Amino acid sequence: MALRFPRFSQGLAQDPTTRRIWFGIATAHDFESHDDITEERLYQNIFASHFGQLAIIFLWTSGNLFHVAWQGNFETWVQDPLHVRPIAHAIWDPHFGQPAVEAFTRGGALGPVNIAYSGVYQWWYTIGLRTNEDLYTGALFLLFLSALSLIGGWLHLQPKWKPRVSWFKNAESRLNHHLSGLFGVSSLAWTGHLVHVAIPASRGEYVRWNNFLNVLPHPQGLGPLFTGQWNLYAQNPDSSSHLFGTSQGSGTAILTLLGGFHPQTQSLWLTDMAHHHLAIAILFLIAGHMYRTNFGIGHSIKDLLEAHIPPGGRLGRGHKGLYDTINNSIHFQLGLALASLGVITSLVAQHMYSLPAYAFIAQDFTTQAALYTHHQYIAGFIMTGAFAHGAIFFIRDYNPEQNEDNVLARMLDHKEAIISHLSWASLFLGFHTLGLYVHNDVMLAFGTPEKQILIEPIFAQWIQSAHGKTSYGFDVLLSSTSGPAFNAGRSIWLPGWLNAINENSNSLFLTIGPGDFLVHHAIALGLHTTTLILVKGALDARGSKLMPDKKDFGYSFPCDGPGRGGTCDISAWDAFYLAVFWMLNTIGWVTFYWHWKHITLWQGNVSQFNESSTYLMGWLRDYLWLNSSQLINGYNPFGMNSLSVWAWMFLFGHLVWATGFMFLISWRGYWQELIETLAWAHERTPLANLIRWKDKPVALSIVQARLVGLAHFSVGYIFTYAAFLIASTSGKFG
C-alpha cells in the first residue's frame, strides 16, 4: 500500500474516515507526537524549519522589491513623495469593464494598478534607495539569501551537519551569540548603513559600491573617534529648513540628539536614529559577553537563578530549579519568546505612528492607519499563543519534584487568588464602563446631553504634562520651565521634543478628554478579560476543582461528560479558543479608537470625536455608519469607483465571518449529512465520478468544529475591518 498522509503517524494514516485528513493537519506541526520522534530529532526538525521560515521571509520581501521596481512608480514618487500615490503592483485583469480600468489607472500609471499602503516606499526612500535599479539589486540579494537559507536548512538535516542536543541546550552560548551577534552586530551594521548611505542620500549625495570608499561620511573622518572628541560628530546638524533628499539646508553631523521631528518630513531625524542604533549596538555587544561559556569568564545563568532566593519568611525557594525547567522545555521557551515578541509588536504599532521613523509616512494617513491596525492584530495573535504554549508546558513538561516551592509552584498553589482577582478587576471594569456609556446614551436619547457623566482623565493628563505637554496647565517636570529636568535637556534634545509634543498636527501625546477616558477603560476591560481567560487556562491546565486529573487528557480534549459536574469548555485549548474572541474584540476597540481619533485629527474636526465618543450611539452612528457610507458605494447601480474592491472585500469579509457561526453554533452532525449527500451526488455525476472519494465523511469533532469556526470568525473579522479602514481613510484623503 502506498504511503498515505500523514506519514508521521502510521496509526492515523490507516484511519478510513475524513478524521485522517483533519487530525493529520492538526498534528502536522506537533513534532512531539510524531512516530519515532526522539529529543534529538525534535530539536533538529525545529532548527531546520527556522531556515525554511527565513527563506519564506526573504522571498516575500524580495517579491515586494521586485514588483515595485517592475510595475511601480518609485522613481516618480521620489521626486514628489507627498503628491504621487505609490503603486504596489499592476492589476492584470480588472473586472467590470472600462469603468474599472479607468478607476484603477492612477498614480501616473498607464494601466490599472493597486496603491501601496504598506509604507515600503517611505521605508526604502529613508534608507537611501532612489532608483528602480536599487530595488532590483535588493530583490536579487534577498533572493540569494532565500536560496542560502534553504540550503542551510537542508544541510543541517544531513548526518554530518546535524547539531546535537547538547548544542541546542547550551543556553549561555546561544544567549551570547544572539545578544552580540544578532542584536549587537546587526545594530552596528545598521548604524553603518545609516551613516554611510542613508544620511548622505538625505543630503543629496548618492553613495553606492562604486564610490563607497571615496566618500567620507563626515568631513573629519575617523579623527574624532580616535582622539576622543566624539562631540564633533554632533556639530553642524541639518537645519530646520533642510529639504530632505537635497543639500539645501543640510549639515554634516552624523550622530546627534536633536529631539523631535524633521520639519519637512515629519519623521525622526536620521542622525538621531543613527545615534540610537549605535548606542543599542554598544549595549548589546557588551551584554553578549556576560555569560560564561568555554572561556570561563562571565556568569552562569544557573548560578544567577539559584541565587534568587528570598531572604526568609514564607516566600518559598525563589528561582531554584527554574534553569533546568526552562532549558528542557521547548514550550516554556516558546511561550517566553512569544510573550516578548507580542509586546514588542504592539509597541511597534504604538511607536510607528507617534514617533514616525520614515520620511513623509506621517502624511500618508491610510498607510499610518493600515500599519497600526496590522501590527496590533499580529500582536494579539502572538500574545495569545504565548499562553497556549505556557499551558502545553504545564501539561507536557512541568515536573513538580524539580520545582518544589519555587516561583512556578507557588503560582500554581495560589492560582485561585490570581484568577479571582483578575475576575474581580474584569467585572468592575465591565460594569462601570458599560454603566457610564449606557447612562450617557440615555441622556442623549432624552435630549439632555448636559446630564452625561463626563470624567476628565486628570492622571493621564498629568503624565502627558510631565512629558512636556503644556496645554493642560499642570506646570510639572518638563512642562515647567524652572525644573532641573528642563534645565538638563535645554541645550540638547529638549527644544526639538517640546516643539513636537506641543504641535497639534502630529500624533505625539494627543490631547485627551472624557471620550478617551471611557474608551481607555473599555480597552482595559478587554485586556483584563482576555488575560483572565488565558491565565486561568494555563494555571488550570494540569487540573482544576472539577477535574483534578486533567493533565492525563492532554492539551485539547472536547468534553469529559456530565459526570464531573459538566466539563465542557474546560481544556486548556478551550481557554485559548475563548480568549481569541476576546482578543479580537479588544483590538477592535483599540483600532476603532485609534482610527476615529485620527480621522477627526486629520480632518481638523476633533470636536466630533470629543462630543460623540462619550456614548455608544455616537460610536455606532458617527464612526461606523458615517465612515462606511463611501465604502458601501464602491459600486452601485450607477457605476463604480476605485473603492469597489474594498466594497467587495467588506461584503466578502462579512460572509467569511458569518460562515464561522455555522461551525460555532450549529449541530455538528449536520455537516456529516451534508458532506455525505454531496459525496453521494458527486459519485453519481458523469465525469465527476471519475474522481472517487475514498475517506468516509464523519462529523467534525467538537474541537475541530470550534477551530474551523474560530478561523472563519477571525479571518472574516479582520478582512471586514481592513476593508473598512483602508476605504474610509483613502476615500477621504486619497
UniProtKB/Swiss-Prot annotation:
Residues binding chlorophyll a B1, per UniProt = 654
Q: Which residues cross the membrane?
A: 46-69, 135-158, 175-199, 273-291, 330-353, 369-395, 417-439, 517-535, 575-596, 643-665, 707-727
- What's in the keyword line of the UniProt record? 4Fe-4S, Chlorophyll, Chloroplast, Chromophore, Electron transport, Iron, Iron-sulfur, Magnesium, Membrane, Metal-binding, Oxidoreductase, Photosynthesis, Photosystem I, Plastid, Thylakoid, Transmembrane, Transmembrane helix, Transport
Q: What is its EC number?
A: 1.97.1.12
The UniProt record lists the keyword Magnesium? yes
Membrane topology qualifier: Multi-pass membrane protein
Q: Give the binding site residues for [4Fe-4S] cluster.
A: 559, 568
- Which GO-annotated molecular functions does the record name? 4 iron, 4 sulfur cluster binding; chlorophyll binding; electron transfer activity; magnesium ion binding; mRNA binding; oxidoreductase activity
Which Gene Ontology terms of cellular component type are present? chloroplast; chloroplast envelope; chloroplast thylakoid; chloroplast thylakoid membrane; photosystem I; plastid; thylakoid
Q: Give the UniProt record's GO annotations in the biological process aspect.
A: photosynthesis
NCBIfam families the record matches: psaB (TIGR01336)
Task: Please explain the role this protein plays, according to its UniProt record.
Answer: PsaA and PsaB bind P700, the primary electron donor of photosystem I (PSI), as well as the electron acceptors A0, A1 and FX. PSI is a plastocyanin-ferredoxin oxidoreductase, converting photonic excitation into a charge separation, which transfers an electron from the donor P700 chlorophyll pair to the spectroscopically characterized acceptors A0, A1, FX, FA and FB in turn. Oxidized P700 is reduced on the lumenal side of the thylakoid membrane by plastocyanin.
Q: Describe, as the record does, how this protein assembles with itself and its partners.
A: The PsaA/B heterodimer binds the P700 chlorophyll special pair and subsequent electron acceptors. PSI consists of a core antenna complex that captures photons, and an electron transfer chain that converts photonic excitation into a charge separation. The eukaryotic PSI reaction center is composed of at least 11 subunits.
Specify the protein name.
Answer: Photosystem I P700 chlorophyll a apoprotein A2
**Species this chain originates from:** Arabidopsis thaliana (Mouse-ear cress)
Q: Which gene encodes it?
A: psaB
